[in-house]
Amino acid sequence: MTDQRIRTAVINGFDNAPPLDTGAPIELQFAVDLGAICADAWLDLKGDVRLHDYAAHQAAAFAHGMKAAMQDAGEVDVHRVTISRQAFAAGLMGRVQQHLFAALGMVTREPRTTH
């Protein structure tokens, strides 16, 4: 019997926050990881920058960098840039969600949100 589960990109857990399944395809794990790293950097700013402004700027910068790298390689794929940007945003917001739930004591093992 073969395993028919679809593998998705997961944000690693920490302390009181279990891993979070982003729903993004596993091939986009790199984008999810970069988004989570950016979220950690935003948290270190301790409110100096509004979350919405930070997320919008970082997602745009990520997409711009990815598109530039594709142009250098001579193979721009607009769809791939778009889904990678969405995975990046899922990583960023997912990490913020993990911190929010942990701070509120809302540790969950719901299969749709955790892995």
Predicted features by range, described:
Residues 31, 35, 39-41, 61, ...:
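Alpha-helical oligomerization interfaces
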Residues 2-43:
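Short terminal alpha-helical segments
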Residues 1-8, 23, 104-115:
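Short intrinsically disordered terminal tails
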Residues 17, 27, 39, 51, ...:
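Intrinsically disordered, low-complexity, compositionally biased regions/tails
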Residues 75-115:
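Amphipathic alpha-helical binding modules
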